[in-house]
Amino acid sequence: MRCNERNKKKAIFSNDDFSGEDTLMEDHLQLREKLSEDIEMIKASLKNNLVCSTLNDNEILTLSNYMQFFVFKGGDLVIKQGEKGSYFFIINSGKFDVYVNDKKVKSMGKGSSFGEAALIHNTQRSATIMAETDGTLWGVQRSTFRATLKQLSNRNFNENRSFIDSVSVFDMLTEAQKNMITNACVIQMFKPGETIVKQGDYGDVLFILKEGKATVFINDKEIRVLNKGSYFGERALLYDEPRSATIIAKEPTACASICRKLLNIVLGNLQVVLFRNIMTEALQQSEIFRQFSAEQLNDLADTAIVRDYPANYHILHKDKVKSVKYLIVLEGKVELFLDDESIGILTRGKSFGDQYVLNQKQKFRHTVKSLDVCKIALITESCLADCLGDNNIDASIDHNNKKSIIKKMYIFRYLSEQQCNLLIEAFRTTRYEEGDYIIQEGEVGSRFYIIKNGEVEVTKNGKRLRTLGKNDYFGERALLYDEPRTASIISKATSVECWFVDKSVFLQIIQGPMLTHLEERIKMQDTKVEMHELETERIIGRGTFGTVKLVHHKPTQIRYALKCVSKRSIISLNQQNNIKLEREITAENDHPFIIRLVRTFKDSNCFYFLTELVTGGELYDAIRKLGLLSKPQAQFYLGSIILAIEYLHERNIVYRDLKPENILLDKQGYVKLIDFGCAKKIQGRAYTLVGTPHYMAPEVILGKGYGCTVDIWALGVCLYEFICGPLPFGNDQEDQLEIFRDILTGQLTFPDYVSDQDSINLMKRLLCRLPQGRIGCSINGFKDIKEHAFFGNFNWDKLAGRLLEPPLVSKGETYAEDIDIKQIEEEDALNEGEPLDGDDSWDVDF
């Protein structure tokens, strides 16, 4: 049985609207310059504050400067229980009483603070505070506090990133890789006279001076002074060797530091990454290798032989080369000779050998000689064989071309790798002469075609519509449906060559749940739906902003879900931008494990999202029926969620509210991620506190900026809930501040009945408080999670191809709500009323 049952958790979305508390504080605000003792008291209080626990002294001082002075008389109300809070206060003088439900529970004096939760978001006050005597407070508004945190965080990131750009060892890294390193920077403070590094010691840290000065000594002799922007120790990231100098802080000095261990976590071995980047870029410049898949290029980079050569060395000699087919210069310079005549010089990142890769039987006629000490990557016949398997170069490129074409089409896009490869192998080639009919309008078709060479004309009722050429395709619907062709395709060139596959072959490869899924998805997309054609059957769900109805399309009887969102609720809660963003993101989503939007409507009262109907109920309920999940069950659900979240992250979309309540199961038992009200397209970092408290990552709470890493944390919470039962942090808490406190400082523990070490290890690594150390947040992304030992026996390909048996398949239909149609009119009436004042042009895109 699942222990520690919990109620469904709701998302919160912080905003900084003007509140009654803001108005009240205006009456008590007085200008006063802070004395040194005031600043010290404020700093001490802030350091004990949950949200400020990770800030350095300079950041604490900056926040102290934004504190305002408030004066109260005995009996004055400061904050009121139940009202939305927006200020955090520190008592400067006097006594203040705390009341809960009109009962006095304690008194507070100088140095005490209250209202901490208001710094995080606009939650209701849990107590009333009144001045017992005349007194004064230092206070800061949430909007000011979080805006200051954002400003400090942005300034720090941008400054660190500019320093990273100046370090030559990072020159060949990508923008994403440099950002990874910037996020991994740790600030270290040194006092005057303090040693930063010592000559002869072995080190693994790179230091960049952010503030202050430092002196360089070699053999106790002063050599020079380093200023802001100088860096030292870069070789420590690459090599195990002693420091060549001693460096001592000359004045109070701040350094951004990067250690090799953390760098290996977020990026991998720096030298390997640098060389891999050079190889990948060189291969992508090759006429041959640019036609390889990304996976094949990675395999080549992994198997390439990297060697060091001295100056003036014959690396490859025309009479002695046997297996080498391609070379890439990683460091140094080489000279290329043909028939003993120099034909060019290759520098770092340059490559050579296309002709020998394309024709592997051709004898190597060139000579390659090093001009200075250099490092070369060599690709041999064996490397190519490991990468391509049994295929030759032409066959591999042909396979890749077909794959790139069919992956653009929804009917094939989400086939498993095995299904996709079987389909490609099933393609046959056929030729047509000029004027030949390839398919004829009105005939029932059974073949799908891709144009390999030549051009064809598309005609309908004898009228020419358009011309198709190489890599264009037609006839894909014939693989699923017995229906007449809607147009004719006629060979236009002297000779047209096409790849084709027959329906009978396709149906041997694609069967069962995947075939049913494709048929239903395409049928849904084919149907043109208008609002007046929909008939409501019942209410199947409800949320903060409205209801979800089960409707059917009267002309076709296809059933859909219709999410009805109240305009009044959206406007009153200032969520206009978020509902627009939800529509934009949902409309672009196209993944089998994410809810599919058909179209949107609007009227004077509501917005409407028409989506596919998902009938298997919520994952929240499913895991309660199943009890504690077995490892295979947890693998299935977590793996499915990972594929959906990975799809979003590839498009720079952070979901921000991942939890079992936001995942439905379809009639086959596979997952559907729903409700994109908290999602955001992200460039750089986001700062808004949004999501469900128990599932929030630490970086969301702290307010210093976050990215897609927050969804990885939520995966860890879900996995913990699947396997352990309760939530990992704040399980017994409803007070949001206490939930946040446990997320930031609580110990992660595991029940005695959970003994699988792979599961425990993955949960620990997903629930790492430092995002840069969290599995799935390195440059490898979700690959690290998929290759974790927890998924050691899991078949990702079968999951994608719907070839796994789900843990639970609903008997009949299950919905979060099931309200009879008679109550629907009452629900609709709640959305009606006089329009709210304000600009109504914001919803023109609906």
Curated annotation (Swiss-Prot):
The ranges of region (Disordered) come to 824-846
Signal peptide (from-to): none
Q: Where does 3',5'-cyclic GMP 2 bind?
A: 466, 475-476, 478, 485-486
Record-marked site positions (Part of a catalytic triad required for cGMP binding and cGMP-dependent kinase activity) = 477, 525-526
Q: Where in the cell is it found?
A: Cytoplasm; Endoplasmic reticulum membrane
Q: Where is the Protein kinase domain?
A: 534-791
Span list, region cNMP-binding domain 2: 169-268
One cellular-component annotation, GO: endoplasmic reticulum membrane
Instruction: Outline the segment boundaries, as ranges, of region: cNMP-binding domain 1.
Output: 51-166
Cite the record's Acidic residues compositional bias ranges: 825-846
Q: Which SMART domains match?
A: cNMP, S_TKc
Q: Provide the residue span(s) of the region labelled Autoinhibitory segment.
A: 1-22
SUPFAM superfamilies in the record: cAMP-binding domain-like (SSF51206), Protein kinase-like (PK-like) (SSF56112)
Region entry cNMP-binding domain 3, spans? 288-391
Reactions listed under catalytic activity: L-seryl-[protein] + ATP = O-phospho-L-seryl-[protein] + ADP + H(+); L-threonyl-[protein] + ATP = O-phospho-L-threonyl-[protein] + ADP + H(+)
Q: What is its main location?
A: cytoplasm
What highest taxon heads this organism's lineage?
Answer: Eukaryota
Q: Which residues bind 3',5'-cyclic GMP 1?
A: 106, 115-116, 118, 125-126
Activity modulation: Activated by cGMP. Not activated by cAMP. cGMP binding allosterically triggers a conformational change at the alpha C-helix of cGMP-binding domain 4, which bridges the regulatory and catalytic domains, causing the capping triad, composed of Arg-477, Gln-525 and Asp-526, to form and stabilize the active conformation. The cGMP-binding domains acts cooperatively to activate PKG.
Residue runs in coiled coils: none
Q: Where is the active site?
A: 657 (proton acceptor)
> Mind telling me how this protein is modified after translation?
Autophosphorylated.
Recorded GO molecular functions are:
ATP binding; cAMP-dependent protein kinase activity; cGMP binding; cGMP-dependent protein kinase activity; metal ion binding
| Domains: entry comment | The cNMP-binding domains 1, 2 and 4 bind preferentially cGMP. The cNMP-binding domain 4 binds cGMP with the highest affinity and is highly selective for cGMP. The cNMP-binding domain 3 does not bind cGMP but is required for cGMP-dependent catalytic activity. The cNMP-binding domains 1, 2 and 4 can bind cAMP but with less affinity.
Q: Which family does it belong to?
A: Belongs to the protein kinase superfamily. AGC Ser/Thr protein kinase family. cGMP subfamily.
Return the protein name.
cGMP-dependent protein kinase
Organism of derivation: Plasmodium vivax (strain Salvador I)
Show the taxonomic lineage: Eukaryota, Sar, Alveolata, Apicomplexa, Aconoidasida
The coding gene here is: PKG
